Amino acid sequence: MGNKLKFGLLGALGYIAPRHIQAINNISADLKCVSDLDFNSAQKKEFLSKNIETLDSLEEMIKFHQKDNLDYISICTPNHLHTDQIITCLENDINVICEKPLALSVSDLDRIRKSESVSAAKVFTIMQLRFHESIIQLKQNMTSQKSDEKHEVIPVSYTHLRAHETYPH
């Protein structure tokens, strides 16, 4: 196998970040740097003990990329930050893997699309709930019904509350 893929992770202390770290490890890629606004010294030491740089901002991660050429930045930050962070990565030709939603409005999604169209990089999003037990069961129930049965479309709402300490202060 050739060179390992190099990743940066933005929002390293967030709820979903450990799953991204696990996925990066599962494909034998290198997590080169992580960033979060709220690192304490113990958290920094833990990452540093694994030869993972700890950074305080996306801007620092961009500088890291300029010297170490990251293949991807994985964005695990609060939703309202995604659009500007994605665009910054695209402007620096860094591929982005971003938690859903990519954007909070159609106009923001259009901004992302426009930025991607002039960038050498691409944006990828995550829809991990397709493997959630409840979703799998729903799909099985839908596909097991006879084809001549009428189907009713109903709105489904899934709420996952994050711990208070994961929100910016």
Each model region followed by its residue ranges:
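N-terminal Rossmann-like dinucleotide-binding module
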Residues: 1-50
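Conserved small/polar residues in nucleotide/adenosyl-binding loops
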Residues: 159-166
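Short strand-turn motif at the edge of the Rossmann-like AdoMet-binding core
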Residues: 100-101, 127-129
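Beta-loop-alpha module in the N-terminal Rossmann-like domain of NAD(P)-dependent dehydrogenases
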Residues: 53-113
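Oxidoreductase and adenylate-handling cofactor-binding alpha/beta cores
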Residues: 131-154
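Local beta-strand N-terminus motif with an aromatic residue
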Residues: 31, 70-73, 150
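Rossmann-fold dehydrogenase core element
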Residues: 111-128, 151
